Amino acid sequence: MTGGAGAIGSAIVEGLVSSGHRAVVIDRAGGVSADLSVEESTRAAAAEVLRRFGRCDVFVHAAAAFDLAALADLDAATFRHVLAVNVEAPLWLAQAFTPGMAERRFGRIIFVTSDTFWDPPAPVLLPYIASKGALTGIMRILARSLGPDGISVTAVAPGLTDTPAARTVNTEAQFDEVMDGQALKRRLVPTDTAAAVAFLASDGAAAMTGQILCADGGLILR
């Protein structure tokens, strides 16, 4: 998986390991080092995973770039950086891992997206939300095209989750405001997302593909 160093990512790793998976993290400081904003680095990381571990049965993309910019301030470099990490990197990794999955007639691809795709909370999230929309479209078309090979492609869309990173850009009042809009009146924690990912990687989700699980406390009722 990618993005295993953050609060949500590390919770996903722990959840997968506790479910019996052997987890390999692709990240700047992961078990396999990579700069996901650079295509060559991403492809090299995929090759290293296959060389060192032989196969990938479940691929989770949890890494994300959060560069903030509203329309008036957005520049090409910022937009391209977000797209490189959030959209292109999972494509190159899926491209590398799916041939083996298809050969074994089994594979799971799980993208971590965001509920902000349906209800954008702030103009400065333009690059981030655009990338999550693109990733959602990719998830659906891959679900259709890879299904005949026994590969499912799904996504988890977390809501505002109480993490150190989220606390740097959200006040206590903002956390409370979002929680007030949720059907479930509690703050979301990283294990909420991790549990959804673990389910999608499990035998219990064998009939699911092309679907998004919203782990957002019922903020977006879909």
Predicted regions and their residues:
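Alpha-helical segment proximal to the catalytic Tyr-Lys
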Residues: 99, 144-145, 206
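Short C-terminal tail/terminal secondary-structure segment
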Residues: 119, 198, 209-222
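Active-site helix of classical SDR
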Residues: 94, 131, 139
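A conserved structural motif in NAD(P)-dependent oxidoreductases
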Residues: 182-193, 204
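Substrate-binding pocket helix/loop in short-chain dehydrogenase/reductase
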Residues: 70-71, 78-83, 178
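Conserved NAD(P)H cofactor-binding loop of Rossmann-fold oxidoreductase domains
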Residues: 62-67, 217-218
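Short, small/polar-rich loop/turn modules that mediate ligand/substrate recognition or access, typified
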Residues: 147-152, 208-210
